[in-house]
Amino acid sequence: MKRKKIVVALGHKALGTTLPEQKAAVKRSAKVIADLVAAGADVVITHSNAPQVGMIHMAMNEFGKMHTDYSAAPMSVCSAMSEGYIGYDLQNAIRAELLRRGIFKTTSTILTQVEVDPYDDAFNNPVKLIGRTLTKEEADAEEEKGNYVTKTEDGYRRIVAAPKPQDIVEIDSIRLLLDAGQVVIAAGGGGIPVLPQNEELKGASAVIEKDLTSGLMAEMLNADMLMILTSVENVSTSRISSPERTITSPVIGWITS
């Protein structure tokens, strides 16, 4: 029987915000992943990084203030750092859960770059929330540095561009590991946004919506299923439709962005 190929997208609620929360959250997420593996599925996991990448960016900027020999870390570098440490916790949690069930299967994390279009309108209209809630004073300081900030119910948040993913650079590596029977963690936080420039890939000052990258990955891998684990109560039709309609039963069809 052909094994089902499933792309699982973990939202930020499945990862927590602080390091202790993340340690506990990935153990819960690992049980879900292990259930799929035990049922005979080949699994690729993507995950959010919205709180983490913003906090890394802020921490690196503050470190740069204290140590002037160090420059501020670009957003693309912060995305790479978040992929690494979230992948580390998630990979070990999945490995341990599989071993507890007597399943001997390698889990690997792939540092993943995702190409974006430099002319994407998102670069002129940043909307993606990152990092923790800021005070008014902190928000003013961020704006003085040229960063975008928006007011929320709880205070203020940094916002950055969120261009659409165009291509997944490491898709062949992901496919090879999946075909070899490994559990693969890839495109954390939507992947590291990069712009192709001749032979090189340059990091973009942006983050990518992980659900869009997950959809692209499912398409490129010819996956049987895309599973998005989220904390929202239910799925609704587009917010711009009139009226918005809540979906309460399974629907087979296309999801467009």
Language-model features, listed with the residues they occupy:
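A glycine- and small-aliphatic-rich helix-loop capping segment at beta-alpha/alpha-beta transitions
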Residues: Q22-K27, A59-Y70, N124-R132, E199-A206
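Short beta-strand segments at enzyme active-site cores
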Residues: V7-A9, D42-M55, T106-L111, V184-A187, ...
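Short, flexible, mixed-charge acidic loops at enzyme active sites
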Residues: M55-T68, S242-I252
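Conserved phosphate-donor
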Residues: D224-L229, E233-S242
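N-terminal glycine-/serine-/threonine-rich phosphate-binding loop
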Residues: M1-N49, M55-K65, L176-G181
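Polyanion-binding loop/helix "lid" in catalytic or ligand-binding cores
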Residues: A24-V32, P74-N92, E97-R100, A161-L178, ...
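Ligand-binding beta-strand-loop-alpha-helix segment within the catalytic cores
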Residues: F63-V184
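Short, active-site-adjacent cap segments at secondary-structure transitions
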Residues: A14-G16, A50-G54, V116-Y119, I192-V194, ...
